[in-house]
């Protein structure tokens, strides 16, 4: 029984590894055009994640294929991965000091079966400077990330606070993925808390057994 991650993202690989499940990587490699402004962002993320999983499942019959898609939404506008320095600069200026939503959908495919779920995290950006933005662009940070930033970036430190799942903003909610695998009947156990990042132990999506043990230790 093989679990396949349909993503080339090193961040998603690292997050999935936290669950302690052996997996292989087989990226879907599809075009991801952003729909019109009035499209429903949750539906977009779910449809793209499902499509990625379906593409890879078609060439891997019998395997379990996991895919994800992340969209960043600011006042109804979907922000993709910037394609130029100018676009990255404009995105980061737009988000600076403001709240926005990050939606990540996770899809699992095996044969003709599909399981899809998503979660939303609200993110408040800090008041970084124009010089901070320029330095981030010079390092090449924005160009492979929806919205042009990484919440975990130690240099830009773009985020002041968030509400919801932290790993969802990184690109794959660990607990949403864990729950989806369980619902589909894939054999997965609760991760060893010693290997869980602190943000995952305190995540609002974490199972009660994890959050209660964390609270007791405190």
From Swiss-Prot:
Matches recorded under InterPro entries: ITPase-like_fam (IPR029001), Maf-like (IPR003697)
Site (described: Important for substrate specificity): 11, 70, 152
Top enzyme category: hydrolase
CDD domains attached to this UniProt entry: Maf (cd00555)
Cofactor(s) this protein requires: a divalent metal cation
UniProt record, GO biological process: nucleotide metabolic process
Any one GO molecular function term: dTTP diphosphatase activity
Keywords of this entry: Cytoplasm, Hydrolase, Nucleotide metabolism
Active site: 69
Cellular localisation: Cytoplasm
EC number: 3.6.1.9
Pfam families reported in the protein's UniProt record: Maf
Keyword Hydrolase part of the UniProt annotation: yes
The UniProt record lists the keyword Transit peptide: no
GO CC terms of this entry: cytoplasm
Family affiliation: Belongs to the Maf family. YhdE subfamily.
Name of the protein: dTTP/UTP pyrophosphatase
């Amino acid at each position: 029984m093989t679990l396949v991650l349909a993503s080339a993202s090193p961040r998603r690989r690292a997050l999935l590894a936290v669950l302690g499940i052996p997996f292989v990587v087989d990226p879907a490699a599809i075009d991801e055009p952003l729909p019109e402004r009035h499209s429903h962002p949750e539906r977009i993320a779910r449809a793209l994640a499902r499509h990625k999983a379906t593409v890879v499942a078609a060439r891997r019959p019998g395997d379990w294929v996991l895919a994800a898609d992340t969209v960043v939404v600011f006042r109804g506008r979907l922000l993709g991965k910037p394609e130029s320095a100018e676009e990255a600069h404009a995105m980061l200026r737009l988000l600076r000091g403001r709240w926005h939503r990050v939606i990540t959908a996770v899809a699992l495919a095996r044969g003709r079966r599909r399981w899809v779920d998503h979660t939303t995290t609200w993110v408040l950006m800090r008041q970084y400077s124009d010089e901070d933005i320029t330095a981030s662009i010079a390092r090449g940070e924005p160009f492979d990330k929806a919205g042009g930033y990484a919440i975990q970036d130690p240099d830009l430190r773009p985020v002041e606070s968030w509400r919801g799942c932290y790993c969802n903003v990184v690109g794959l909610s660990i607990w949403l993925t864990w729950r989806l695998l369980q619902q589909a009947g894939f054999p997965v156990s609760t991760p060893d808390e010693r290997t869980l990042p602190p943000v995952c132990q305190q995540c609002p999506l974490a199972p009660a057994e994890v959050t209660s043990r964390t609270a007791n230790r405190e």
